[in-house]
Amino acid sequence: NRRYIGNKHKLIEWIFSILDKECDKSGSFVDIFAGTGVVAAVAARHFDEIVLNDFLHSNHAIYQAFFSKGEWSREKIDNIIKDYNNINGEDLEDNYFSENFGGKYFSKNSSKIIGFIRENIEENKANLTDKEYYILISSLLYSIDKVANTVGHYDAYFKKNYIEDGFFMR
């Protein structure tokens, strides 16, 4: 579950009640404003092909993780995430993410961990299948949303004296 302004989750029942009446549930389903993909996830149970559209690159990564066909190893992903969750932010040097987002959107330590993980995924991309790469990126995105010091978008953050460390990748 991601924090997202457009939340279509509440509309799913209504959307599919209309589709039940008006459409042959086979062939293709196109989600023009796919957002987090919540509508497409339900449509995937009913249609042969799903086409998703969104202008955010982060959403493209999530679509690849959830909807693309491809080889991946759950054990490999679980082990990588386990290793990431054993990282202590105090042991890391500052990185692009911590310098730009630490102390505002995230605690300094959480932002160092997030930045390290993002760089590490990219550095190890050659050792991952495309699906594994996008699963890790998506897991990072969802985990970031859980600890973000925002209301769901990154135009502004809560101005606090203390931001709790709490990053944990799922």
Predicted features along the sequence, with ranges:
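Class I SAM-dependent methyltransferase "Motif I" SAM/SAH-binding loop
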Residues: F33-G37
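Class I S-adenosyl-L-methionine-dependent methyltransferase module
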Residues: E49-V51, F55-R170
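Conserved aromatic-histidine-acidic binding/catalytic patches
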Residues: R3, N7, D31, G102, ...
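S-adenosyl-L-methionine
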Residues: N1-S28, V38-H46, I62, K69
